[in-house]
């Protein structure tokens, strides 16, 4: 390659659009389909209207949502286009109105459903990233940018809240929905643990399968105090026979021996007994019917939520959860037998990065839930006073706006995280570029965390080895390497599943016991 070609290539690669491209791509994806995904998840807002006798239920159905370009309402009531420089000088927020289709529906089991009011109403304002597709200066030439007071070399990728420039820090976290096996210590003994951070629709649950010092497996997950016997939980999920449980864990003779020890110690033999046992744990002292109801709710809601799929029957989902727990049990046993090494938490294959679009999606989800609670309250109040129920009277747009702007202004994010949003470092031009490409670890800087702070071989070409601060943040706050590419929109696994299916790969539930035994005999 000629010297001129190399220069041209490097200049085009390190242009201002490329330096903050990971922020733009993530945020644009959030505006295009991320917001709509959150609204589709919510689907409808239920109310308490209809609880009394002779009263028809009322609910709100949510439709399409869209954000327009940033505007400002002047004192005379007129709306004008807002540019970033004007927002900086006037100390206002660079945000755009968000419109959502909402329908108020009334109807009961006997009565036909009637739509009382349908309209696209303004539900709040969304802070817009400077330089994103919805930004008013997107696509402007250098001359046009200079004309409106913008710096043509400014990379964008930040928000303007009350006149202050705020950048969202890329967050580094352990990969969700992935089994990680490791050693741990309990009561002075070394034990084997398989864990997974099960995540779905903003809810994250840590599920642990531990092999205690007696060699028995125990499972811990949210909303259940202490741990539950592995065999009890798997039977509650629908795997009843000893043979089926052993087969789903492993066909290896040594692992089968471990599993037989667990089955001998089991207190329950049927699914009904297992659910009763679980009910006594999650609702002790309550009536039997309530205990059963609560036990079913807990295993459906809090145990491995990422295995829930829309349109899949509950029974099938439970069996899939049982198979997943069996895989976790196998990982524990393999670790105990020395067949596998403990997973490296610092390996970059076990890490995932949350960029601005992912962070905004989390924020929008909590803001929408707050808006839904407010709409429910306003509807019930209007109904109690016998007022006409219309969309515009029950939606207060400042509720959503406040929940979106305040965390970006302060840096205090949902889930108790702080320092997610920071003031853009304007010390010099390189400081801005560095700040836009910075990422932070959720680990506490007051703890040693020597291994997490160390350079890892898998960071080669992804993370800059030298750009990290001195002092307590050393190794926890890092920066992207210059030629780093961040893959995005990889959460949707449907295409991957279709591709694997076309290659003849069978899912775990489709593999029968006869198939496995035949295969092992042929080997």
Curated annotation (Swiss-Prot):
Major site of localization recorded for this protein: cytoplasm
Keyword annotations from UniProtKB, A to Z: Cytoplasm, DNA-binding, DNA-directed RNA polymerase, Nucleotidyltransferase, Transcription, Transferase
Record function comment: DNA-dependent RNA polymerase (RNAP) catalyzes the transcription of DNA into RNA using the four ribonucleoside triphosphates as substrates. The Rpo2 subunit (Rpo2N and Rpo2C in this organism) is implicated in DNA promoter recognition and in nucleotide binding.
Positions of the UniProt region annotated as Disordered: 501-523
Keyword Cytoplasm annotated: yes
Root EC class: transferase
Gene3D superfamilies: 3.90.1100.10, RNA polymerase Rpb2, domain 2
Protein name per the record: DNA-directed RNA polymerase subunit Rpo2N
Localization of this protein: Cytoplasm
Biased composition (Polar residues): 513-523
Any Gene Ontology CC annotation: DNA-directed RNA polymerase complex
Entry-linked Pfam families: RNA_pol_Rpb2_1 (PF04563), RNA_pol_Rpb2_2 (PF04561), RNA_pol_Rpb2_3 (PF04565)
Catalytic activity reported: RNA(n) + a ribonucleoside 5'-triphosphate = RNA(n+1) + diphosphate
Family annotation (InterPro entries): DNA-dir_RNA_pol_su2, RNA_pol_bsu_protrusion, RNA_pol_Rpb2_2, RNA_pol_Rpb2_2_sf, RNA_pol_Rpb2_3
Highest taxon, organism lineage: Archaea
Molecular function, one GO term: ribonucleoside binding
Gene Ontology terms: biological process: DNA-templated transcription
């Amino acid at each position: 390659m000629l010297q001129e070609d190399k220069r041209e290539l490097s200049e085009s690669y390190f242009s201002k659009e490329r330096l903050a491209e990971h922020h733009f791509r993530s945020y644009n994806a959030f505006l295009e389909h991320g917001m709509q995904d959150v609204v589709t998840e919510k689907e409808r807002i239920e109310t308490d209207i209809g609880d009394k006798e002779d009263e028809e239920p009322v609910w709100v159905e949510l439709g399409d949502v869209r954000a327009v370009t940033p505007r400002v309402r002047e004192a005379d009531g007129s709306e004008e286009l807002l540019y970033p420089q004007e927002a900086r000088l006037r100390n206002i927020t660079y945000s755009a109105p968000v419109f959502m289709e909402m329908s108020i529906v009334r109807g009961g089991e006997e009565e036909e459903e009637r739509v009382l009011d349908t309209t696209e109403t303004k539900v709040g304002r969304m802070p817009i990233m400077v330089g994103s597709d919805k930004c008013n200066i997107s696509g402007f030439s250098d001359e046009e940018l200079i004309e409106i007071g913008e710096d043509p070399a400014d990379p964008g990728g930040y928000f303007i809240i009350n006149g202050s420039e705020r950048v969202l820090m890329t967050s580094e976290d352990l990969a969700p929905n992935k089994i990680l096996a490791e050693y741990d210590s309990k009561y002075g003994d070394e034990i084997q643990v398989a864990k997974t951070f099960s995540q779905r629709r903003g809810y994250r649950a840590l599920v642990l399968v531990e092999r205690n010092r007696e060699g028995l497996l125990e499972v811990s997950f949210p909303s259940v105090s202490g741990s539950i016997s592995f065999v009890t939980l798997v039977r509650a999920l629908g795997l009843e026979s000893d043979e089926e449980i052993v087969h789903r864990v492993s066909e290896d003779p040594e692992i089968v021996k471990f599993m037989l020890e667990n089955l001998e110690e089991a207190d329950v033999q049927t699914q009904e007994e297992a659910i009763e046992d679980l009910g006594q744990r999650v609702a002790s002292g309550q009536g039997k019917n309530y205990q059963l109801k609560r036990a079913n709710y807990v295993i459906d809601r809090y145990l491995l939520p990422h295995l829930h799929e829309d349109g899949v029957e509950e029974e099938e989902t439970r069996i899939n959860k049982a198979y997943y727990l069996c895989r976790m049990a196998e990982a524990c046993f393999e670790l105990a037998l020395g067949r596998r090494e403990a997973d490296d938490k610092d390996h970059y294959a076990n890490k995932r990065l949350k960029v601005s679009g992912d962070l905004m999606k989390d924020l929008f989800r909590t803001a929408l839930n707050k808006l839904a609670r407010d709409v429910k309250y306003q509807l019930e109040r209007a109904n109690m006073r016998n007022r006409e129920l219309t969309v515009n009277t029950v939606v207060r747009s400042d509720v959503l706006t406040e929940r979106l702007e305040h965390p970006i202004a302060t840096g205090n994010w949902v889930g108790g995280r702080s320092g997610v949003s920071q003031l853009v470092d304007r010390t010099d031009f390189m400081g801005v570029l560095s700040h836009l490409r910075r990422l932070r670890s959720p680990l506490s800087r007051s703890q040693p965390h020597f291994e997490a702070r160390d350079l890892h071989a898998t960071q080669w070409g992804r993370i800059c080895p030298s750009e990290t601060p001195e002092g307590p943040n050393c190794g926890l706050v890092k920066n992207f390497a210059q030629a780093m590419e961040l893959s995005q929109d990889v959460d949707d696994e449907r295409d991957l599943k279709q591709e694997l299916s076309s290659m003849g790969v069978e899912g775990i539930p489709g593999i029968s016991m006869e198939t496995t035994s035949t295969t092992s005999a042929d080997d």
